[in-house]
Amino acid sequence: MKKEIKKNKYIIPCAIELVLALFFIILILLPDREYSVDISGSRYNESSDTAAFSRNNSEMYRYVTEPVSLPMGRYFLKVNYECAETSTIIYVYNGAKVIQSISLTAENNIQSLETWFSRLSNPVSCTFLSNNAAPVKIDNIVFRRTDYIYYMGLITVILLFTITCFAGLIDSGRICPTKEETATALLLVGMIIISCIPLYNDVIYLGHDSRFHLDRIEGIKEGLLSGQFPVSIYPLINSGYGYATPLFYGDAFLYIPAVMRLMGFTLQFSFKAFIFMINAFSVIAFYFCVKKITCNRKYGLLGAFLFIFSTYHFSDTYGRASIGEITAWGFFSLIVVGLWNIYTMDVDDKRYSHQWIVPMIGYTGVIESHIISTELVAMATVLTCLVLFKRTFKLKRFLNLLKTASASIAVNMYFILPFLDSMKNENVVITRWKDIDCAMQANGIHLADLFRVDIPQMFLEVRFFREVYTGLGIAFGLGLLVIIYVFIRYRQKAVKNKPFIFFS
């Protein structure tokens, strides 16, 4: 009897959560509800003292639409119009309060925004300006309610279902994590949460490339809405004319925040959630990589800690906002652990023939994330193969490396071929470096500066950036000395399974 009660303690909540999940899925599958604002009923606002006024020697008139009742939720507002002045603005009112505004530009005929209504019923109206000299023609104003609330409910139910199932498995004894495993999991979760502290607010810290990546996310979303898949042209860029950014910058992983945008989540939340996912993946990947190589759980935690809390990682994530680069980092660990398995595993092991899969996934992730990282990883891989040439050119190992390279290229051919074709035939800045003086030699540093650790007198001058920030620094220099010492110390010993030799 007690066992039956113990089972029902988890079965009944799971059943309720499954029913709720099915309910939210049905609501999501229903067509989006659209609410049209009655433009024909627009009236001149005679009650306002400022309804008529002069601007540029022409009489301006403020018009108000009939209110439409909107239920609580997140909405996309779309305006189709024609106007001759870019200064025309549509104000969106919820009752007597202005909640949003849209600037109507003469260059476009469609504008859109998103807004949120928190009350159960919201009397929404719009006002706009027009004059006889440059009249504004509003074709239609449509509010489309998104499934944001339903998706939030579905995600919440799925999380509760996962927690309930996991608790049931632990309670039933089917999963018995040790204290060490529990502590490891808690430490990894703690690293992820702490590393994402800058995300826990209602603003976005705009780094160097934030606007560019936000435009990419919105570009994918709008491209999907226009019927493109995969999205080759971002419609929003260049005043609606679009731009083929995906030809030069892989965006496979940006479909995650773009789909979140389609679900009704805000751009800010989608962007932050994506960074959170990247940090979580990177921490877990680095942990398993170092643990696999060192066969030590503590070293795995140390490696993940040193990575996620490194100054460069924080600068890259929140200062430079190099989303492509930080996405690629998580896949670096897959490449390292994959090559480690290929070079250290017994070639006669039955599992050896499948060891190309993990590094192939790693190379694919880097290619789809960041081109510069791809070049660096390719050079590092070639150098590793040459340094370990005695192992590289053994038949089975060489075949595994060959399968890794060929599979990585084949899987990403849809991106690589257009990229190479565009680099060769398109007139872009990177291919005209001789004309614009952006050669590597003009922006590099002297060999001596690479090892500088002092701060030059020209602290505020341009050369300071090249001399200090691109120098290796004290930490790297000391680390290099340690590696050289260890290598010399153990050079005459059997170090087949010593991980530091591989890393060095």
Where are each of the predicted segments found?
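Solvent-exposed strand-to-loop "edge" motifs in beta-rich extracellular domains
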Residues: N80-A84
